[in-house]
Amino acid sequence: ANIQSFSFKNFNSPSFILQGDATVSSGKLQLP
């Protein structure tokens, strides 16, 4: 995905930090 480093503090209020491909891992998107 082109969405990049997501860090979900709250599934209702996600924090988005754009910066590279990411994969979903336990409520967090992490760069591979």
From Swiss-Prot:
The keyword Cytoplasm does not apply. It comes from the Eukaryota. GO terms for molecular function: D-mannose binding. Keywords: Calcium, Lectin, Mannose-binding. The keyword Calcium applies. Homotetramer. Belongs to the leguminous lectin family. Metalloglycoprotein, containing Ca, Mg, Mn, and Zn and the carbohydrates galactose, glucosamine, mannose, and fucose. It agglutinates erythrocytes of blood group A1. This is Lectin. It comes from Macrotyloma axillare (Perennial horse gram).
